[in-house]
Amino acid sequence: IRGYCDHYSHEGEYVVVGRQGALCGNVRLIQGQNYLSEHAIAVRANEKNDTKFLLYLLDFMNLGQYSDQGAQPGLAVNKLLRLKCNVPEKKTQSKISSFLLTYDKQIAAQERLLSFLTDQRKAFLQQLFI
């Protein structure tokens, strides 16, 4: 295991933004106890924001476009802190994120079904032509 750590640096629900390299600008939601290195930015919602809404907002903002374009792309936290955007009140944010999460669950279910059907087709062809 590369980079194993036996303790955690963050606990709770966070949006994590890839800060360097190939994952620069990628956005994911994490929950529980996690260890984040200096190659990730942890975003925790305050009392005025919904974490899952921030996930969708930051993903939509395509943060990778703000990376330095050197040999290894990198996002500077101070550059991201200067970005401005208007957001609705928390209750509306929660409704929006719930709505989008419903779509994400449907998309994930369809992707699993497609993968299953693709595997079934491949197995059928192997049985047929072998």
Which residues does each predicted region cover?
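DNA target-recognition domains and sequence-specific DNA-contacting regions of bacterial/archaeal
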Residues: 1-87
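Amphipathic alpha-helical coiled-coil/heptad-repeat segments
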Residues: 86-130
